[in-house]
């Protein structure tokens, strides 16, 4: 590991790195979901970046902490406290692929939810996670 390992709250400027790390953690599931949201001329990663740059929502830079080594983003954690009571909302409006995850979230109201924990490949096996 070259450079000092530091942790800090994510900023909007980190949205691109967060989108890539979220997709790494989700093993392509986020990219699949983002592909259903993109408009013509927009890349899947741009959708992820826009979602990470939001001020609200579970996947927002406001819920993320980044790990840096030598000033370079190496990893991230996205997490937040689940609402209590937890409102599942209208499951029909949620992509079918993630409905089971939302249902499981509803089983643990008020708990701390780790949505994403991911490290870029070149920084793995260094104890960051």
Where are each of the predicted segments found?
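Glycine-rich acetyl-CoA-binding "A-motif" of GNAT/NAT acetyltransferases
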Residues: 72-75
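Conserved acetyl-CoA pyrophosphate-binding loop and the N-cap/start of the following alpha-helix
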Residues: 123, 127-128
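Conserved GNAT-fold acetyl-CoA-binding loop/helix
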Residues: 26-52, 63, 86-89
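Short loop/turn motifs at secondary-structure junctions and domain boundaries
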Residues: 55-61
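Cytosolic beta-strand hydrophobic patch enriched in CBS
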Residues: 64-68
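Conserved acyl-donor/pantetheine-binding loop and adjacent beta-alpha core of acyl/acetyltransferases
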Residues: 78-116
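Conserved N-terminal entry element of GNAT/NAT acetyltransferase domains
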Residues: 1-16, 24, 31-36
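Hydrophobic adenine-recognition pocket in adenosine-nucleotide-binding enzymes
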Residues: 10, 117-119
């Amino acid at each position: 590991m070259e450079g000092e390992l530091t942790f800090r709250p994510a900023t909007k400027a980190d949205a691109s790195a967060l989108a890539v790390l979220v997709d790494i953690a989700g093993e392509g599931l986020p990219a699949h979901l983002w592909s259903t949201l993109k408009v013509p001329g927009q890349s899947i990663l741009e959708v992820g970046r826009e979602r990470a740059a939001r001020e609200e929502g579970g996947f927002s830079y406001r819920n993320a902490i980044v790990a840096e080594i030598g000033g370079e983003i190496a990893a991230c954690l996205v997490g937040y406290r689940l609402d209590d009571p937890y409102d599942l909302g209208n499951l029909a409006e949620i992509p079918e692929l993630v409905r089971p995850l939302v249902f499981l979230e509803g089983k643990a109201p008020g708990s701390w939810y780790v949505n994403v924990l991911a490290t870029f490949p070149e920084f793995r096996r260094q104890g960051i996670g």
